[in-house]
């Protein structure tokens, strides 16, 4: 039986959807202990609890999971975006699309939500050989048991737009899926302003193509 609370769309403040919060002061966020991460990090409480359970299971199998990035607010994401905007040359539309291969416009990142984390390395190549391949294989086999999945897979008939594949990026589906639905209902392009090239948010339809451009929850997985 599906838990009815999972199907209900909770009320999230727009500030939470857009990343206009300080996770260190927000009631629903916990600070991640240093044993799990490489720098000061925050996650939603239920996400952190699920990650700790996954971390323990991975350790028991000889797999080490390390958070290298977790919650990022809109201001932080704006810094990432603007630096790339200034460093990339060429036509503005092309520039925006090239940045969007792997980086989100401010106000559109799943990292704003406290549900998503980057693990171990920020290169797909790391996860294609050696220890990285072992880590990725373990995550593919077991992450869903703890509520996590890879939202940015290779493009396929279901996911034919959005960011390129990110083998390091894992999302806590039970909460992220609810926030994503709330985002679709509450956010429009008038709220995605204030950064370099912001006109391309609507021109490139980033809400539908990028925020919503994620993989499906794995078949036969919990939740």
Q: What is each PLM-predicted segment?
A:
Residues 1-70, 74-223:
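Extracytoplasmic cell-surface/polysaccharide-interacting catalytic and binding patches
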């Amino acid at each position: 039986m599906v838990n009815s609370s999972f199907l209900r769309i909770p009320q999230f403040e727009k500030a939470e959807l857009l990343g206009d919060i300080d996770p260190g002061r927000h009631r629903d966020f916990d600070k991640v202990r240093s044993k799990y991460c490489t720098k000061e990090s925050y996650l939603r409480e239920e996400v952190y609890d699920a990650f700790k359970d996954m971390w323990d299971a991975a350790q028991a199998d000889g797999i080490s999971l390390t958070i290298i990035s977790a919650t990022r607010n809109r201001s932080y994401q704006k810094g990432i975006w603007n630096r790339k905007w200034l460093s990339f040359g060429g036509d503005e539309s092309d520039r925006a699309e090239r940045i969007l291969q792997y980086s989100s416009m401010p106000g559109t990142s799943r990292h704003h939500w406290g549900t998503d984390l980057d693990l171990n390395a920020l290169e797909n190549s790391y996860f294609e050989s050696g220890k990285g391949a072992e880590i990725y294989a373990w995550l593919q086999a077991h992450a869903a048991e703890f509520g996590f999945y890879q939202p940015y897979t290779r493009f396929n008939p279901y996911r034919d737009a959005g960011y390129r594949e990110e083998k390091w990026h894992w999302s806590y589906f039970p909460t992220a899926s609810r926030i994503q639905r709330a985002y679709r209902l509450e956010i429009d392009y008038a709220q995605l302003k204030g950064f370099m090239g912001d006109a391309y948010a609507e021109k490139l339809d980033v809400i539908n193509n990028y925020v919503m451009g994620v993989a499906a929850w794995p078949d036969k997985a919990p939740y």
